[in-house]
Regions:
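Non-catalytic accessory/interaction domains
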Residues: 1-156
Length: 156
């Protein structure tokens, strides 16, 4: 059982908003493995049974960023290293995008995002690799002005 809650991250330069809306949680039925939707309603948390699934939104249909707790990130990383295909390509791509985007806005440690990307040595699908490449390009563009950038560049 997992507790799902919502969290808002206001970006600098944008006015804070108290607006809330229902969030669809795309899951699979434990027994039939058929897709189901559980709605996280305003001002609430949900306790859900994900069965054997380790990530939300296996098909990458959601319009929200998903941030997992540290324990679940470690479980996801372990599963990706043992068998990347245990998580569908769409979910692996989304995991990469969410992790790096959340790190870019300061809502997640870059250590989690970078640790997730290590499994890509075994990746056979292009979309997760392409997503990592886009985020690393962005990260490098932000670091080029740093006085120690040349030391970082040697590692690339």
């Amino acid at each position: 059982m997992r507790e799902i809650c919502r969290s808002f991250q206001h970006l600098p330069g944008h006015p804070p908003s108290n607006a809330q809306w229902k969030i669809p949680l795309f899951l699979r039925d434990r027994r039939t493995l058929e897709p189901t939707v559980h709605w996280l309603v305003e001002n609430s948390t949900a306790i859900i049974d994900m069965g054997n699934d380790i990530v939300l939104d296996r098909d990458g249909r959601s319009f929200v960023r998903v941030r997992y707790d540290s324990e679940l990130y470690h479980d996801i990383i372990a599963r990706l290293h043992s068998d990347a295909n245990c998580i569908p390509v769409a979910a692996r791509t989304r995991l990469m995008d969410d992790s790096f985007t959340l790190a870019e806005i300061g809502n997640l440690s870059y250590a989690h995002a970078l640790n997730i990307s290590v499994y890509l040595r075994k990746e056979t699908a292009y979309p997760p690799v392409k997503m990592l490449h886009a985020h690393l390009d962005f990260l490098v563009s932000r670091l080029t002005a740093h006085p120690q950038f040349s030391k970082f560049q040697v590692r690339l």
